A protein has these predicted regions:
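Conserved phosphate-binding/catalytic region of the ribokinase-like
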Residues: 1-29, 51, 174, 224-325
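Glycine-rich phosphate/adenosyl-contacting loop at the front of the ribokinase-like
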Residues: 1-80, 87-94, 98, 268
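Structural motif
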Residues: 27-29, 150-151, 209
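Active-site metal-binding loops of divalent metal-dependent hydrolases
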Residues: 33-34, 157, 277
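Conserved N-terminal subdomain of the carbohydrate kinase-like
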Residues: 45-50, 72-154, 324-325
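Short, conserved phosphate/pyrophosphate- and ester-handling motifs at nucleotide-, phospho-/glycolipid
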Residues: 70, 213, 275
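Active-site-adjacent beta->alpha loops and helix N-cap segments on the catalytic face
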Residues: 162-168
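Conserved phosphate/ATP/ADP-binding segment of small-molecule kinases
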Residues: 172-181, 186-258
Length: 325
């Protein structure tokens, strides 16, 4: 791993953050999930029957989304996640290769690929997730994949699963010990209630930073106010960034005062993947020497790009049309 950058944008060696092979930018390593996203939009569902709507298929998974947005921002990206030896796995591998995202391990796992069903009905989103091959994260492979990283993203999802918790925790700890900018993302608020969220907090304390949206922060702390929640979380993990949608984010470090960082005004088309784009922008700015508040500003700017298009990944264009319309 590459030591953390100082305020001048240089790491502990006195050199700029390490560039990824084949990329002009630093290498962001993302640990977590690779999924097929199936997005269903309908005004209302007919229980037990058919209804007209739209169905979109595309690559996803929180860590994969972060990697895709890191590449869109000009950085290198390495994804540590599982894919199955099936049609979905081959499609996902092709999507990663098209964007220049390195996948570790390169070999498919002996199971189906992960999938996420997103149903948007009357303005509400519901999710059904099957982690599939992502349950096959190996601790030694995960830690080995961190070599050369200028920054590290650890999704909360593998921390919330007993099968992958040790590997994700090891990634957070290795990054923290190396002094590399690293974050743990809180994943999803329904999964964090009570003691269930403790592995996420423990890993974030090792990495030094927790990213959470308003609902996740409230679930972890009991405080609905983002500023109060950020302060409570920062006292536990070091730095907390609470995302608040169009209102921006609140950043708090240690025992300091929470600092609001506004988001750019933009017309939102699809908020899917916005938090993951934020994470990519935040980490790349931290790797370049920005402080937490400055990095949060960079994150909101990349998130603004994400909400201006459909899908969790920045779309390639094929024949003038978006790959994922």
């Amino acid at each position: 791993m590459t030591p953390t950058a100082d305020a001048g944008g240089r790491n502990g060696t006195g050199r700029p953050p390490q560039a990824a092979p084949g990329s002009a930018g630093p290498l962001l390593v993302c640990v977590g999930d690779l999924m097929v996203d199936v997005a269903v939009d309908a005004p209302a569902l007919a229980r037990g029957g058919d209804v007209a709507g739209s169905v979109r298929l595309g690559p996803g998974g929180s860590a994969a989304n972060v990697a895709a947005w890191a590449r869109a921002a000009g950085a290198g990206a390495r994804l540590v996640a599982g894919r199955g030896d099936d049609l979905a796995g081959r499609l996902l591998a092709a999507a990663l290769a098209e964007r220049g995202i390195e996948l570790r391990p390169a070999e498919p796992a002996p199971s189906a690929s992960g999938a996420l069903l997103v149903v948007r009905e009357a303005g509400e989103r519901s999710f059904v997730a099957d982690p599939g091959a992502n349950l096959h994260l190996d601790l030694r492979q995960v830690v080995g994949a961190l070599a050369g990283a200028a920054a590290v993203f650890v999704s909360g999802y593998p921390l919330l699963r007993p099968e992958t918790r040790a590997a994700a925790m090891a990634a957070a700890g290795a990054a923290g010990r190396a002094g590399v900018p690293a974050v743990v993302d809180a994943a999803s608020w329904p999964l964090l209630a009570g003691e269930a969220g403790q592995p996420v907090l423990a890993a974030a304390a090792l990495a030094g930073t927790l990213l959470a949206n308003r609902d996740e922060a409230a679930t972890l702390t009991g405080a609905p106010d983002p500023g109060v929640a950020a302060a409570l979380l920062a006292a536990t993990v070091g730095t907390a960034v609470v995302k608040w949608g169009a209102a921006g984010v609140v950043v708090c470090t240690g025992n300091g005062r929470p600092r609001p960082v506004p988001a750019p005004a933009t017309g939102a088309v699809d908020v899917t993947g916005a938090g993951d784009a934020f994470a990519a922008g935040y980490l790349l700015a931290r790797a370049g020497g920005a402080d937490a508040a400055e990095a949060a500003g960079a994150g909101t700017r990349l998130a603004a790009r994400a909400v201006a298009t459909h899908g969790a990944w920045p779309a390639l264009t094929i024949g003038g049309r978006p790959e994922y319309p």
